């Protein structure tokens, strides 16, 4: 996994609550057996009209947001299905960082596993960010090591992150390789299980 | 020892390595697999030269994108490739697979319990958010992403943050016609779609105690719709009776030994939950969703809410989106909403209890001319049992289609799609935009309510059915 220490990019705002993974990547695109190439399907039903043309009403289609790599999203982002195709699609679309007041648990975890940083931000701070970035073409820097977001206009805001995931992202660790080092612990655990569980 | 909840007990029993200030490394007893979320995980193993650590703890079936008519003819080439990939992966890595030829095939959350793979006290995962279903047995069961599927395949463990605990207590007696589906929809309607985020739920109280295993599965299934990755019900005699003599359940003395262990799986007196909520079961009505998430739900005898009734600005904005998408207007009576489609099926409501409840409503009646209605049994075993009981004939005579088992119109990955702008009374779990097809309008209901909607062409309070019965 590519380490993620700090990221600078344009921020886009999608100020809707309860954006579910069916919207992030509709089910017709889950039939592929690859892990890449989902970006063009991200938000498909919102993003394109019936003729396959970009829908001008959809927030992320605004010219000011083109090339954005940081998504400022609404509450309960990523709710619904466990499909990891959702973070794959967002990543492939270009988003590395997602900032929201709250995330669904499975989606939140899936982001970390793909080297993306989901930041849970207290509602008032988040609201302030929305005000600063909505309908604008503005860059921000997300410094994971310092847990600080700042921009060229002098705005600065700190954020919380789980220390475990911070370490994993900064070092770009492969989780499975780390767990495999604990083989002895796993074996030991297995040897003590009830017999009905061994069947 | 400090009194503990059942959630903490199961958690503690599965810690391989306690992470100080970190997630715990949890042992996984059962890993269920299906065709959609596993191919990339197997590919990861292949690339790194890794093996499946415990094929005997892994079980696969195909359910998400298989046809429910002419099931062996998958016309969609991309979907077919996914099914073929599962067959190849299971063979190469030595994983048991219930394929389309198997009598054990069905929706992964229906067959796990049927086969006795799902048992109390186990940790169970699957690359599917409705894995919470298995919590009905007093198991700790939750959905995972594909990276985690790969992690479990190669290590039989997962790093997990210890969850907070949430008690959802429903006491009292349900009115005739009010079902498990209505109970869970009422809970989500009252507390919203994210009150369970970060928690594992334990459902307690008389109402859940009086439920069959099928009904308990319906409740736990929709824990994820409340934001909780997992929801469970402490096992009791009903659970033990269900588990006895299933294909993979331990037999004889081993079973008795297991039951002794399962009896300890209950929340100790004095144990404290991080949060508790209470509902009065007597007051729950048959529920119908009107909007674009399962929290937008109301008793059948009410009206679509007005935008003014939402105090938070965000909720109001979402409600306005919902009216537009659903083609509804504020103050419209729920019972006046007409449906063109009825779907009885999904991992929420496709088991024997569900089919029996629906069949009861339609016996000797006809599906309205304006409605297309389908029944998709959750598994081959449910299908066979229903046919043995003659339920298929009741459905067919009423004008329902009787299909082969699979996920079908719950997420419409196969050809079972609701056309744009049309409305479906559905026993599934999600009424998200586009879930049953682009522009399709989904109303989540119980099997009994869906059956009544099929007959009348619009929603009808199922309690009236029982009143009529009493009068006659």
Swiss-Prot record, chain B:
It catalyses: (2R,3S)-3-isopropylmalate = (2S)-2-isopropylmalate. Its cofactor is [4Fe-4S] cluster. Induction: By superoxide. [4Fe-4S] cluster binds at residues 347, 407, 410. Signal peptide: none annotated. Binds 1 [4Fe-4S] cluster per subunit. GO terms for molecular function: 3-isopropylmalate dehydratase activity; 4 iron, 4 sulfur cluster binding; metal ion binding. GO terms for biological process: L-leucine biosynthetic process. Pathway: Amino-acid biosynthesis; L-leucine biosynthesis; L-leucine from 3-methyl-2-oxobutanoate: step 2/4. Its EC number is 4.2.1.33. Keywords: 4Fe-4S, Amino-acid biosynthesis, Branched-chain amino acid biosynthesis, Iron, Iron-sulfur, Leucine biosynthesis, Lyase, Metal-binding. Belongs to the aconitase/IPM isomerase family. LeuC type 1 subfamily. Catalyzes the isomerization between 2-isopropylmalate and 3-isopropylmalate, via the formation of 2-isopropylmaleate. Heterodimer of LeuC and LeuD. This is 3-isopropylmalate dehydratase large subunit. It comes from Bacillus subtilis (strain 168).
